[in-house]
Structure formats: C-alpha cells, structure tokens
Swiss-Prot record:
The gene is spvR. It comes from Salmonella dublin. Its main location: cytoplasm. InterPro entries: LTTR, Tscrpt_reg_HTH_LysR, WH-like_DNA-bd_sf, WH_DNA-bd_sf. Residues 1-61 form the HTH lysR-type domain. NCBIfam families: PRK15243.1. Gene3D superfamilies: Winged helix-like DNA-binding domain superfamily/Winged helix DNA-binding domain. Transmembrane segments: none annotated. Positive regulator for the plasmid-encoded virulence factors SpvA, SpvB, and SpvC. Pfam families: HTH_1. This is Virulence genes transcriptional activator SpvR. It is found in: Cytoplasm. Signal peptide: none annotated. Disruption phenotype: A disruption of this gene is no longer virulent in mouse infection. 20-fold reduction in cytopathic effects in human monocyte-derived macrophages, loss of actin depolymerization in macrophages. GO terms for molecular function: DNA binding; DNA-binding transcription factor activity.
Length: 297
C-alpha cells in the first residue's frame, strides 16, 4: 500500500536487507534503473557512499548501516500501521520476517525462491524473541524465519547441510605426539565463531563424546569477535569452532584442528495457528523447506 512509507526509504531498506539489485527489483516490482537512480540520488544528497558494488552484490558502508539501525524501527512502525488501517476488503500480503542474525546467504536464497515462484510477499528483518514471535503470529499475516529455537506452538525446523562441516581448533599446547590430550581438554571453554552458533548441536555433542570422550563440553555462546577468539585459542584458554568455508576464506592452518562432518544449520519457521493458516502459508512454507533442504550453507 505504501501511503505512509516514503519511496526512497522503502528502496533503501529493501536493498539493505536483500543486498542485491536483482532480488530487490523482484521484491519491489520495479526495474533496476529506478533503483539505481534513487540510490545515486540519495548518495548525492547525503554526500556519502551508501553501498559498494562488488560482483553483483551490494555491500553496505558503515554510514548506510548506521542509517539502517536508526530508521528500521520507524519503518516497521509505519508498515504495521499501514497494515492496520488499510482496506479491510483486500487480502493482506504474506509477510516474511527474518531474524536479524539469520545468515544473509540463506536469506537471499529464500527471497529469490519466493520471488521466482510468483509468491507475493513483503520482506522484513528485525530482532525477535519468543514474546515477539508469539505476538507476530497472533496478529500478523506472517512467517518468522530464525536460526534460533524458541518455544512456539506452531513451528517446524528445517536443516541445511553445512558445506564441509566445521573445524574444532584446539590449543597447540594441548597436543601430545600429534594427538590432543583429552585430560587437558575437559572443562576448556568451546567458543563459537559467528554463524556456528546456529548449527545442530546434537552432531557436535556426539563428536565430543565419541571422539574426545567429553560428555559435557563447556560450550560458550557469548558474542566474541574472531580476533579475541583466536587470541584465547593461542593462549590456550579456549577451543574454537569455525565453519570449514570460513577457515578456507581466512587461510587458517588446520594442523591443530579436528574435522566435524555432517553438521547442519537449523532454521526454525514460526507461523500462525492452524485457524489462521491459509494456502499462501502452506505454499510458502513448502517452498522454503524444499529450498533449505536442497541447499548448502
């Protein structure tokens, strides 16, 4: 409907959340030229770069991220107000709401699949918790997608294979004769690199128990940046779990690391009760399930 939301704001928010001109054109139902013109105009007005164009993707600048954080709550409020006071006789568009920590690559994959299928949706991103999910699914025409597991009476979990699995980095001083000293590992905190927190822990628990003989690993889910995590690893203060693809991208040596295979990223889909469920929901959920199952992270 967009009678309250400024066109420039909607384009900016959409580009921030899709990271792609091609996906944004499908979401907004306009061609690429007007999108480029709006962003170029904004950059001239603000005298600051908003995006760096690289290999077909848009990388937000720090300036753009600052603006996004400040205006997103305003955008969400206006959008909700439009939905509330809009014409009651018109079927509301299905909303797909992504948890703000959901991996960008899978987010773009889902958006692209929904767009190609012709499913009319409104894409949003926001921080969620169990209470927010409950409220959204009681009052909105939406599906909430998160890599975090919250209690909700209507939900399902999809698993996406993690390409190459993950590497468990162990402090060098814990190795004896080329093998990790199990006795020294017990009780050592296990840190998660960003993104690894959302993996299915059953597989990782099983690896610790079967391979290392550790039945109760000291997992730490604190938000620690990669530099600090690597420093603690080097000092022998912690172990570290990092996806294989990240190890390759960073060029990390895996001489003192163990490979954990068969790891999957868990995606939880939250949606309204069956009384409020519509064919649009079933179609979208089935499509998302298929896409996540066939893909790798």
């Amino acid at each position: 409907m967009d009678f309250l939301i400024n066109k420039k704001l909607k384009i900016f928010i959409t580009l921030m959340e899709t990271g792609s001109f091609s996906i944004a054109t499908s979401v907004l139902y306009i061609t690429r030229t007007p999108l480029s013109r709006v962003i170029s105009g904004l950059e001239r007005e603000l005298k600051q770069r908003l995006f760096i164009r690289k290999n077909g993707t848009l990388i937000p600048t720090e300036f753009a991220q600052t603006i996004y954080r400040k205006v997103k709550s305003h955008y969400i409020f206006l959008h909700a107000l439009e939905q509330e006071i809009g014409p009651t006789g018109k079927t509301k568009q299905l909303e797909i709401i992504f948890d703000e920590i959901y991996p960008e690559s899978l987010k773009n994959l889902i958006i692209s699949a929904l767009t190609i299928s012709g499913q009319k949706t409104n894409i949003m991103g926001r921080a969620v918790n169990s209470q927010i999910i409950e409220e959204l699914c009681q009052t909105n025409n939406c599906i909430v997608i998160s890599a975090r597991n919250y209690f909700h009476r209507e939900s399902l979990v999809c698993r996406t294979s993690v390409e190459g699995g993950v590497m468990l980095f162990i402090p060098k001083k814990f190795f004896l004769c080329g093998k990790p000293d199990i006795n020294r590992l017990a009780g050592t905190p296990v840190l998660f690199h960003e993104g690894a927190k959302n993996f299915n822990l059953d597989t990782i628990y099983h690896f610790f128990e079967q391979t290392l003989g550790i039945t109760n690993p000291a997992f730490s889910f604190d938000n620690v940046d990669l530099f600090s995590s690597l420093y603690r690893l080097q000092q022998g203060l912690a172990m570290l779990l990092i996806p294989v693809r990240v190890c390759r991208a960073l060029g990390l040596s895996t001489d003192h690391a163990l490979h954990i295979k068969g790891v999957a990223l868990c995606t939880s889909l939250y949606y309204p009760t069956k009384k409020r469920e519509t064919p649009d929901y079933r179609k979208a959920i089935k499509l998302i399930q298929q896409e996540l199952k066939q893909s790798t992270f």
